[in-house]
Amino acid sequence: MMEEQLIPIQWKDDALVLLDQTLLPNEIVYESFKTAESVWDAIQVMKVRGAPVIGVSAAYGVYLGVKEFAESTEEGFMDEVRKVCTYLATSRPTAVNLFWALERMESVAADNIHLSISQLKDRLLEEAKEIHREDEEINRQIGEHALTLFHDGMGVLTHCNAGALATTKYGTATAPMYLAKEKGWDLKIFSDETRPRLQGSTLTALELQRAGIDVTVITDNMAAMVMSQGKIDAVIVGCDRVAANGDIANKIGTLGVSILAKYYNIPFYVAAPTPTIDLKTPTGKEIPIEERDASEVINRFGQYSAPKESKVYNPAFDVTPHENVTAIITEKGIVKAPFTENLKKIFQ
């Protein structure tokens, strides 16, 4: 049974409206944000998460950060734009879309510095809305390309949430699932719960179920068994950054899934909007990996699952080497090895 689609991000009444994803699946709460500081906090505590929608949120955050700025000089306004962008960039270090969106907003301000301060503010809001619109179209295009690799009746495994909740619509890794549903195909989706924050079970399973898509939740350590039983024909994941050589940073646990897929000879696809591709970063070794609080691992639901004094290592992401990647699916087409050469081509 299909239910109303959850909308992760909206611009409404001169405010950024976000679906608080920390409360899902038990509560559906939308919250308004009217300052750059509140947007920073929403990104950092993961009320909003997923590289594409983080980028869109940050773009709106730039506008909110300068909206009330009273300085009348061009230099003063540009200094404030840079200050807000630098501040928002500290919210989460791994998602390259965040930095891409902030750089784009800063460039727009610099390119239009001849306008009045009021006009500049309007121009920044227009650009944030354009980034928002572009993401919707990018997601659909990724889905259309990915669908050429799928067929009716396939079993597909995904990890974490690269769905409509991580973007503005359709998602990246889930886009072909939504489009397959529109075509009347019956894909059987398996969603890793994705420890420690459980985005696969709380988010991916929630949104696919609401869309009427066949989805089964499994724990992360069940993936090997499900693959060995022949239930998985393809794996598709999103990513937070693609290095120039095709290494990908994605939610912790993705590396293990890629190793299993390679062992069982299952195609491993990565859905990646071009803003996620970072040609300035040579390999995955140079991608900064965010480490998060120990409580996410040992006190996830307000009750300790390990001794309170336990040492905890909690990286939010891992890096999958390009050798494990069958193809990277972008809005411009499907990229296969050699990635160093072919990733450059899509920007030409």
Curated annotation (Swiss-Prot):
The entry's family comment says: Belongs to the EIF-2B alpha/beta/delta subunits family. DrdI subfamily.
User: Where does the record place the site Transition state stabilizer?
Assistant: C160
Please list the GO terms describing molecular function: intramolecular oxidoreductase activity, interconverting aldoses and ketoses; S-methyl-5-thioribose-1-phosphate isomerase activity
Provide the protein name.
5-deoxyribose 1-phosphate isomerase
InterPro entries, sorted: Deoxyribose1P_isomerase_DrdI, IF-2B-related, IF-M1Pi, IF_2B-like_C, Initiation_fac_2B_a/b/d, M1Pi_N, NagB/RpiA_transferase-like
Q: Which reaction does it catalyse?
A: 5-deoxy-alpha-D-ribose 1-phosphate = 5-deoxy-D-ribulose 1-phosphate; 5-(methylsulfanyl)-alpha-D-ribose 1-phosphate = 5-(methylsulfanyl)-D-ribulose 1-phosphate
Q: Which organism is it from?
A: Bacillus thuringiensis serovar kurstaki (strain ATCC 35866 / NRRL B-4488 / HD73)
Q: Assembly state and interactors?
A: Homodimer.
**What is the purpose of this protein?**
Catalyzes the isomerization of 5-deoxy-alpha-D-ribose 1-phosphate to 5-deoxy-D-ribulose 1-phosphate, as part of a 5-deoxyribose salvage pathway that recycles this toxic radical SAM enzyme by-product to mainstream metabolites. Also seems to be able to catalyze the conversion of methylthioribose-1-phosphate (MTR-1-P) into methylthioribulose-1-phosphate (MTRu-1-P). However this enzyme may not function in methionine salvage in B.thuringiensis since it exists a paralog (MtnA) present in the methionine salvage pathway cluster.
Q: What are the record keywords, sorted?
A: Carbohydrate metabolism, Isomerase
GO annotations under biological process? carbohydrate metabolic process; L-methionine salvage from methylthioadenosine; pentose catabolic process; toxic metabolite repair
Could you read off the lineage of the organism from its UniProt record? Bacteria, Bacillati, Bacillota, Bacilli, Bacillales
Pathway the protein takes part in: Carbohydrate degradation
User: What HAMAP family has UniProt attached to this entry?
Assistant: Deoxyribose1P_isomerase, Salvage_MtnA
Primary enzyme class: isomerase
What are the binding positions for substrate in this chain?
A: R49, G50, A51, R92, Q199, N250, K251
Record-listed E.C. numbers: 5.3.1.-, 5.3.1.23
